[in-house]
UniProtKB/Swiss-Prot annotation:
This is UPF0154 protein llmg_1186. InterPro entries: UPF0154. It is found in: Cell membrane. Keywords: Cell membrane, Membrane, Transmembrane, Transmembrane helix. The chain crosses the membrane at residues 4-24. It is a single-pass membrane protein. The keyword Membrane applies. Belongs to the UPF0154 family. HAMAP family: UPF0154.
Length: 79
């Protein structure tokens, strides 16, 4: 009986550790992407330049704020 209980306890602890580790790493990844979005100022300038526009610094910052706001809003909508 003790052997079955020990094995069951190990399996439960392994599953709990797996799910907690997955949850924690997902949370850290979301936080990292919110703090450092993959689209930076140079990428926005390049994208606007490829569309034939010469963006000012104000326009670049406005686009970045819109991207961050949209990401934050989609994150809060999922909760």
């Amino acid at each position: 009986m003790n052997l079955i209980l020990a094995i069951l306890l190990m399996v439960v602890c392994l599953l709990a550790g797996f799910f907690l580790g997955t949850w924690f790493s997902q949370r850290q990844t979301k936080k990292l992407l919110m703090d450092n979005p993959p689209l930076n100022e140079d990428a926005v300038r390049l994208m606007m330049g490829s569309m034939g526009r010469k963006p000012s610094e104000v326009q670049v910052q406005q686009v970045l704020r819109q991207i961050r706001a949209a990401a934050k809003q989609s994150d809060t909508n999922k909760k």
